[in-house]
Amino acid sequence: MSQRDKLIARIRARPSEAYFTDVQRLLELFGWSCRKGTGSHRAFTKPGERTITVPIKDEKVKRVYLDEICERLGLDD
């Protein structure tokens, strides 16, 4: 199993929290770009798609946002 597959499996398992770096890596694998900003939110953009805004608290992302990301990327079971 490749690192990409392991990352996707880890996010699809819907933990209560995930590291922001893992979420960022996943979105970038699917062609999204992180728009740098200040504060506690990061915006990911992709041409032709609505922006995904991800709030970060203590370098972690909550499950509700992981659910939205999985739905937008088509990773739902």
Which residues make up each language-model segment?
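Basic nucleic-acid-binding interfaces
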Residues: S2-T38, F44-D77
